Amino acid sequence: MAKIQFSRGLDEVVIPEVRLTRSRTGDSGTATFIFTNPKILDQGSTEDITGMYLSDEEGEIITREVKAKFVNGKPEALEALYVMKSAQEWDRFMRFMERYAEENDLGLSKAEK
């Protein structure tokens, strides 16, 4: 099962908006995840955000690049950035996203030029 966590053991139920960029050569890319009002930011949550963990049957992809966005002093969103430095990392990430998308009924749309 493909899942996203910000604190180990606590699955995030909010589905993110994901934006992908890839170099022309295909050997690097970035994925930006935007979670609006994620569960981890609920008032009752006492868990620390230690990174973003993308887990599936192949293993785990980890990024520590997680930032909170605040509106009127209250956390409203999380933005996580995952940088891929090789074609292999890109392929692994895409396999995770295919599983995650299938399990959460998500689709892929290309940006307008």
UniProtKB/Swiss-Prot annotation:
- Give the HAMAP family listed for this entry: PSII_Psb28 (MF_01370)
Q: Where does it live in the cell? A: Cellular thylakoid membrane
Q: Which domain of life is it from?
A: Bacteria
Sorted keywords for this record are:
Membrane, Photosynthesis, Photosystem II, Thylakoid
Instruction: Give the record's family classification.
Output: Belongs to the Psb28 family.
What is this protein identified as?
Photosystem II reaction center Psb28 protein
Q: One Pfam family from the UniProt entry? A: Psb28
Query: Residues of the signal sequence?
Result: none
Which parts form a coiled-coil structure per UniProt?
none
Q: Which GO terms describe its cellular component?
A: photosystem II oxygen evolving complex; plasma membrane-derived thylakoid membrane
Q: GO biological process: any one?
A: photosynthesis
InterPro entries given for it? Psb28_c1_sf, PSII_Psb28_class-1
The topology of this chain with respect to the membrane is:
Peripheral membrane protein
Record flagged with keyword Membrane: yes
Q: Which organism's genome codes for this protein? A: Nostoc punctiforme (strain ATCC 29133 / PCC 73102)
Q: How does it assemble?
A: Part of the photosystem II complex.
The UniProt entry, under NCBIfam families, shows:
PS_II_psb28
